[in-house]
A protein has these predicted regions:
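Nucleotide phosphate-binding/pyrophosphate-handling subdomain across enzymes
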Residues: 308
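Divalent metal-binding segments
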Residues: 2-185, 190, 197-265, 285, ...
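Short low-complexity, flexible loop/linker segments enriched in glycine and/or proline
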Residues: 52-53, 134-149, 271-275, 324-328, ...
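Short, Lys/Arg- and Gly-enriched loop/turn segments at beta-strand edges
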Residues: 419-426
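His/Asp/Glu-enriched, well-ordered alpha-helical/loop segment
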Residues: 247-257, 261-286, 291, 296-303, ...
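His/acidic/aromatic-lined binding-pocket segments of jelly-roll/cupin-type domains
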Residues: 9-10, 27-29, 412-413, 432-435
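Carbohydrate-interacting/catalytic domains
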Residues: 9, 444-445
Length: 445
């Protein structure tokens, strides 16, 4: 910024948790043209037109990034969630389309933006929109929803930055190699990639353990072991088709997010990604979605491969007893190995999968801390980074968002209390007072 230019906005008199490379804490932050222009040393940037906000002891952190949140579905269901209204393991149980036309799609996306802003969420990943769901029961995951996102982005009406994964099969259901290849040829809407970006593809490898549909080396109580959801008459053909999907998408440079919960499906997915990376180089930031039964052996491979883990501690806490009922207590004891993942250096993103759960990152972090049996400020930092820094990396956007440093966007979440000073169990009681997107207020309590 030129020396003669003053800031548009200065926040001072509180704590700024930058989550930058040095994990610095500051007392002030200056913003101009939607980006951070100074941290701490802001006095010389205050001019007659600068808005100066006295934080009065409040805390600023980077805007929250819920890296697995079904926005249109959330907006259509809100204030209800699957857990508040009964759990069906997917979108089952809906009497009719939740969004039946363009007006309903727009209203749902805008409502999700309102809900996100009130929680300090400035970015989220919409994990699965596309032709695979064009005849879907809810209407919340269709190609038309992606088109509506693009229209809102180009009109400047989105209240969060959105990353999209395209879906060429059925949500929580089967997919075919032919449909996958056909879908990849479809055009992607043209938008500002810092507002709306289609990053890659979503694949459902299997189901979930409580529904006995995750593909596992274990046996469920009914004697079955699940299977892959990708098309094929036998396991070998299904594995080959899944591997082919991953190889095709990888060679295109697409990011690949794979819903994989069973240990057996996770092994197949990671092996396929590893082979694609070895043959073609690291072309996309791929990741496992959920990863309930990931083994220690596979977990140890992920950092070297650059493969991330996107998991939902709230779901782990809520469905643990159901997993035990399906597979036994011994399997539950090694499920969702969050602490091991962090310790090994796996790129871990925490998320909510809203509206499966409510989209409250504070509750998700509290659930993660309880699951991992950790507490204290360093543990809180680690968990907060899994909702800010690491999701920006997953988005391929760490150079311009996810932490507070000069040149990065001024996406800010202002809290009434410093989260590093509270016990994880008390984090849900910490209030969000203001949310800024690109230096503009999108929520104020």
């Amino acid at each position: 910024m030129a020396a003669s230019r003053t800031a548009d906005l200065v926040l001072t008199g509180g704590t700024v948790l930058t989550f930058d490379a040095e994990d610095r804490e500051a007392r002030a932050l200056a913003v101009a043209d939607g980006t951070v222009v100074a941290v701490d040393d802001v006095d010389g940037l205050i001019g007659p037109d600068t808005e100066v906000v006295d934080l009065a002891g409040r805390t600023v952190l980077p805007g929250i990034n819920d890296s697995h949140l079904h926005g249109a579905w959330l907006g259509a269901m809100w204030p209800h969630t699957l857990f508040s209204g009964g759990f069906g393991g997917g979108e089952e149980g809906t009497a009719g389309p939740l969004v039946a036309d363009a007006a309903a799609r727009r209203a749902a996306i805008l409502k999700a933006g309102d809900v996100a802003a009130a929680l300090g969420i400035t970015s989220y990943t919409e994990p699965g929109l596309g032709p695979g769901e064009d005849e879907g029961q809810t209407g919340c995951f269709t190609s038309a929803v992606l088109d509506e996102y693009a229209a809102l982005a180009n009109e400047g009406l989105l209240r969060a930055r959105v990353t999209v994964l395209r879906l060429f099969g059925i949500l929580d259901g089967p997919s075919s190699l032919a449909d996958f290849q056909r879908g990849l040829a479809d055009d992607i809407p043209s938008t500002d990639p810092r507002v709306l970006k289609v990053n890659g593809v979503k694949i459902f490898a299997d189901g979930i353990p409580p529904m006995r549909s995750a593909w596992t080396h274990h046996c469920y109580t009914d004697g079955t072991s699940g299977h892959l959801l990708v098309d094929g008459e036998q396991d070998e053909e299904r594995v080959a088709n899944l591997r082919r999907m991953i190889d095709i998408a990888h060679r295109r440079g697409d990011q690949i997010g794979v819903h994989a919960t069973g240990d057996r499906s996770i092994e197949v997915v990671v092996n396929a990604m590893a082979d694609a990376i070895a043959e073609h180089g690291p072309l996309g930031r791929h990741y496992l979605i959920h990863g309930d039964l990931v083994s220690g052996e596979v977990l140890r491979r992920l950092p070297g491969l650059g493969i991330g883990l996107n998991t939902q501690p709230g779901i782990a806490a809520a469905t643990g007893p159901w997993l035990a009922a399906a597979l036994g207590d011994d399997v539950l004891r090694t499920a969702w190995p969050l602490r091991d993942a962090f310790d090994l250096g796996v790129p871990v993103c925490l998320s909510t999968d809203a509206p499966v759960m409510e989209p409250d990152w504070r509750r998700a972090i509290a659930a993660a801390a309880q699951w991992m049996d950790v507490s204290g400020p360093e543990a809180m930092r680690q968990l907060l980074r899994a909702y800010t820094v690491t999701p920006a990396y997953q988005d391929g956007a760490e150079s311009w968002k996810g932490s507070l440093a000069v040149g990065k966007v001024a996406d800010l979440c202002v809290l009434d209390t410093n989260p590093l000073t509270v016990a994880p169990a008390d984090l849900p009681g910490v209030g969000v007072t203001t949310t800024y997107l690109g230096g503009k207020v999108v929520f104020q309590s």
